[in-house]
A protein has these predicted regions:
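Glycine/Thr-rich phosphate-binding loops of Rossmann-like dinucleotide-binding domains
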Residues: 13, 41, 65-66, 100, ...
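Active-site neighborhood of phospho(di)ester-bond hydrolases with catalytic His/Asp-centered motifs
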Residues: 32-36, 53-63, 92-93, 150-156, ...
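Active-site metal-binding motif and surrounding structural segment of the metallo-beta-lactamase
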Residues: 38-87, 168-170
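Metal-dependent catalytic neighborhoods of phosphoester/phosphodiester hydrolases
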Residues: 67-75, 99-102, 216-224
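Extended hydrophobic secondary-structure segments that form protein cores and membrane-embedded regions
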Residues: 88-94, 113
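Cap/insert and terminal regions of metallo-dependent hydrolase folds
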Residues: 159-239
Length: 242
């Protein structure tokens, strides 16, 4: 499996950046997950969206799904042109917010709500979802192609579910939305240090994403070192092998 990062920032992007948007590829399958600000043009340039097998949304905050609207518009046009034949499958948590309803109501999408402990299969990929610690319903997941396992923590502060998601994975993508100086247990995100410590605890290689654009990259790298984990800072428009 391979994971491509098209947006690594949150809760908003810097100039020429994008918020959370990723694509997971296996031998048979292309699954996008998260589709934040700037996602459509970047993802569609590398992986035509009409050929994607599914889109997973961890939760309904704008920095994770804001480009779903233009994605829906594009798919409707592609249907009219014959470039796409079926609605794009979206897997997401149950949420009745106005934002979620706006996305779920678009005719371009076929939406399936999933929850804690649910499992789905998309061609050769098997996913298991876990509820994580965020102010709105939010899911992380583990996915395997039968050989390797990739873990995504979603947006989350510390919680037991992250241990279940990350333990034994070959590669993890973790929310390092805060530097430790700005973090406490009531915040909506992990610190970079906390991500690094979590990776060390489980002996897992990790990519730190959901980075605040106001933070200095050097500070982020220093905090990874303090945590002691085998971690790298996410780079946009880069592909990593699981």
């Amino acid at each position: 499996m391979k994971i491509s990062i098209f947006g690594k920032y949150g809760p908003y992007p810097p100039l020429n950046g994008a918020t959370s948007s990723y694509v997971l590829n296996s031998k048979q399958t292309t699954v996008a997950f998260e589709f934040g600000s700037g996602a459509f043009s970047r993802v569609n340039n590398s992986f035509p969206v009409e050929k994607s097998d599914a889109l997973i949304l961890s939760h309904f905050h704008f920095d994770h799904c804001s480009d779903c609207g233009v994605l829906g518009y594009a798919l409707l046009r592609y249907y009219a042109l014959g470039k796409a034949k079926e609605p794009l499958k979206i897997y997401c948590p149950k949420d009745n917010s106005p934002l979620s309803q706006a996305i779920k109501s678009m005719k371009a999408f076929s939406v399936t709500e999933v929850g804690d402990g649910d499992e789905i299969t998309v061609k050769d990929l098997k996913f298991k979802f876990y509820a994580v610690n965020h102010p709105v319903p939010c899911l992380g997941f583990r996915v395997t192609d039968g050989e390797k396992t990739f873990a995504y923590g979603g947006d989350s502060n510390e919680c037991a579910a992250l241990d279940k998601i990350i333990g034994g994975a070959d590669l993890a993508l973790l929310d390092g939305g805060l530097l430790y100086r700005d973090w406490n247990e009531n915040k909506p995100h992990l610190s970079v240090k906390g991500c690094s410590q979590l990776a060390k605890k489980h002996g897992v290689k990790a990519i730190i994403t959901h980075l605040n654009p106001e933070y200095d990259k050097g500070e982020i790298i220093d905090e990874i070192a303090v945590g002691g984990g085998d971690c790298v800072v996410a780079e946009e428009n880069k592909t990593y092998t699981v």
